[in-house]
Curated annotation (Swiss-Prot):
The keyword Cell division does not apply. Pathway: Amine and polyamine biosynthesis; ectoine biosynthesis; L-ectoine from L-aspartate 4-semialdehyde: step 3/3. Catalyzes the circularization of gamma-N-acetyl-alpha,gamma-diaminobutyric acid (ADABA) to ectoine (1,4,5,6-tetrahydro-2-methyl-4-pyrimidine carboxylic acid), which is an excellent osmoprotectant. NCBIfam families: PRK13290.1. The gene is ectC. GO terms for molecular function: ectoine synthase activity. InterPro entries: Ectoine_synth, RmlC-like_jellyroll, RmlC_Cupin_sf. This is L-ectoine synthase. Transmembrane segments: none annotated. It comes from Vibrio cholerae serotype O1 (strain ATCC 39315 / El Tor Inaba N16961). Keywords: Lyase. Its EC number is 4.2.1.108. Pfam families: Ectoine_synth.
């Protein structure tokens, strides 16, 4: 069994801070659950370009308001109680309005813990996941 508190994770290397957001990565690849679980805060009045080419993500808004705009598609409001699922590697813009948004996020494959979006909004794929994908394609 694994038991962790948000506060102890926040005070450790599991907290990753970027320009527009911070993420407390409570469950990671090395926990061997097959997914990772994060509490992510999107800072107020920000817009972040994201394109998870290598990961699927489900996001539940716990507090705050904003919107998600799918590139070339629709814009959806986000408020407490909203769940959105990026099941098509959707390129998108995530915007927080006048208050920060606090989100519970689940990633598959799981993150290792130190990922930050690259210039195209992508998290890199872990080397072992890349090898696994290559074997599946054969």
């Amino acid at each position: 069994m694994i038991v962790r508190t948000l506060e102890e994770c926040r005070q450790s290397e599991r907290r990753v801070v970027a320009e527009n957001w911070e993420s407390v990565r409570m469950l990671l690849k090395d926990d061997h659950m097959g997914f990772s679980f994060h509490i992510t805060t999107i800072y107020a009045n920000t817009q972040t370009h994201i394109h998870y080419r290598n990961h699927l993500e489900s996001v539940y808004c716990m507090s705050g308001e904003g919107e998600i705009e799918v590139v070339g598609g629709k814009t959806y409001p986000i408020q407490p109680g909203t769940l959105y699922i990026l099941d098509q590697h959707d390129e998108h813009y995530l915007r927080a309005f006048s208050s920060e948004m606090v989100m519970a996020c689940v990633f598959n494959p799981p993150l290792t813990g130190h990922e930050i979006h690259d210039a195209e909004g992508v998290y890199p794929l872990d080397k072992s996941e890349l090898i696994s994908q290559c074997h599946k394609e054969k």
